[in-house]
Amino acid sequence: QRLADSKGLTTIVPTWFHVKDTEGNLESIASTDYVNYAHQAGLEVWAAIRDFDGGIGSNDESLQLLSYSSRRENLINQLIGAVMQVGIDGINVDFEKISKDCGVHYIQFIRELSVKCRQNGIVLSVDNYVPKGYNQQYNRKEQGVMADYVIIMGYDEHNGSSLEAGSVSSYEFVKEGIEETIKEVPAEKVINGIPFFTRLWSETPKTQEELNQEAGTEAADYPMKVTSEALGMSTARDKISQAGAETTLDETTGNNYATWEADGVTYEIWLEDATSIEPKLQLMKENKLAGTAAWALGQESSDI
């Protein structure tokens, strides 16, 4: 139903593949019926393979997997086999547990996978964080040579483990991601991902005991204890309405923003909606990117 309701969509990326273990065995929930339905709707299917959320899930495990050529080969062969069997059009690599030590092995995996993809007519795309000094090991420049598309995850600027509340995807964060990526990757190969979700932040002052426990850590610099939950666009709007709060434009982030208090807790939310997304789409057009991606289908409001 989500596919039928979505306009302007060309490609769907279901999270069908996980790395089962460090030997490179594959876990798959790929569906031929789904692929056939998507093809009838005029959509390509690029199935995602992940190194988290099922199967392996740590930097150490990804290193154990990728640092052996036999394990890489095992994973690639199983992956290509599953893709061909179900009639999938592309593979999307979403590996987010790559340490500095693992970088050279990771890029070798992408290199080897790209050869097999070309031989079998499979589109290869690779997901990437917004470029920062601490994630250079992903080697976007080499990815840009070997992959068909390099996808920027232009969100999680503030995420579930953040020590302070903030926007999931501010305008400047997205701008930086695009500008830094196209320094290394041809723009016609770059797709920028935007969020169809936001976070509702809950803040309470830390107790003296909590502050004492955090002494000497980065967390000690933040006097508020912060938790958050991810919400789709419509649910986020509903939360604001239920609280009787007003939204105002936060010109720093480009998001509509709301805050309110209840039972000693301060709530904050930076909305993702047409107001925040339109300028980001304009950035993508100006930089002549290959396209736009979003996480995740079904979280958007009807106007999007």
Where are the model-predicted features located?
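Glycan-binding loop/region signatures in secreted carbohydrate-active enzymes
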Residues: 56, 61, 198-280
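Structural recognition of alpha->loop->beta junctions
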Residues: 5-11, 67-91, 138-158
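Hydrophobic faces of well-ordered beta-strands that scaffold small-molecule active sites
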Residues: 10-14, 45-49, 91-93, 124-126, ...
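Aromatic-rich peripheral "rim/lid" segments of glycoside hydrolase catalytic domains that contact
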Residues: 283-286, 297-304
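Catalytic domains of carbohydrate-active enzymes, especially glycoside hydrolases
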Residues: 2-22, 78-91, 279-292
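A structural motif corresponding to the C-terminal end of an alpha-helix
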Residues: 37-45, 82-88, 116-121, 146, ...
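Substrate-binding surface in catalytic domains of secreted glycosidases
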Residues: 21-26, 77, 100-235
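Glycan-recognition patch characteristic of GH18 chitinases/ENGases
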Residues: 1-78
